[in-house]
Amino acid sequence: MVERTQIINAVTAAITQAPERKFQESIDITINLKHVDMAQPKNRIDETILLPQAIGVKKIAVLGKGDIVSQARNAGVDLIIGPDEIERLGGVPREARKMAGQYDFFLAETAVMPLVGRWLGQRLGPRGKMPQPIPPTQDITPIVERLRNSVKIRSKDRLNMSVKVGNTGMTVEEVSENIDAVVKRVVGRLESGELNIRSVYVKTTMGPAVKVM
């Protein structure tokens, strides 16, 4: 497994080599795989990872009616969509696509999942954003709190994937801790573990890519 010092050195280099900007830049990593058959769906990476260091609040939408709506309001979610609105959005593809792009995570009570699949599945599914089903008695507050500080990493059918792990307003150690968490999670999903990792790079929005491993 990659040593933390390697990660710290790479993050430091990525930040120092980047052109100076007057705005805060994102810091992303790209993980390149090898010897993985991505034609097999079981080998594809699709993980939601809770980061040890927060990188900015994620936007969360809740779909449903009744008790989950009051829970969603109390949890401070960014958007609540009722059954009628689900159906309406399904008839306005452009608006549905915009909504799918604006929000990071979706939760839906189990009762409306068939509606979601019918009307919004084409917009959410390809983005890996189909809602997490919520049973009637489940408290969504801890789920919302966890997702606020989580990222989603997906390979689809490719041998590479990228994800945001921080920003230039964070310390090198904080960003490095997040990178460590993401890499370990991906390695844990691979059949041959670290042997399936070709390389990992880190970069700021406008800066050059620096090799981590």
Curated annotation (Swiss-Prot):
The keyword rRNA-binding applies. PROSITE patterns: RIBOSOMAL_L1 (PS01199). The keyword Repressor applies. Gene3D superfamilies: 3.30.190.20, 3.40.50.790. GO terms for biological process: regulation of translation; translation. Pfam families: Ribosomal_L1. GO terms for molecular function: rRNA binding; structural constituent of ribosome; tRNA binding. One of its GO terms (cellular component) is large ribosomal subunit. Keywords: Repressor, Ribonucleoprotein, Ribosomal protein, RNA-binding, rRNA-binding, Translation regulation, tRNA-binding. NCBIfam families: PRK04203.1 (NF003244). PANTHER family: 54S RIBOSOMAL PROTEIN L1, MITOCHONDRIAL, LARGE RIBOSOMAL SUBUNIT PROTEIN UL1M. Binds directly to 23S rRNA. Probably involved in E site tRNA release. Protein L1 is also a translational repressor protein, it controls the translation of its operon by binding to its mRNA. Belongs to the universal ribosomal protein uL1 family. HAMAP family: Ribosomal_uL1_A. Part of the 50S ribosomal subunit. This is Large ribosomal subunit protein uL1. It comes from Methanocorpusculum labreanum (strain ATCC 43576 / DSM 4855 / Z). The gene is rpl1.
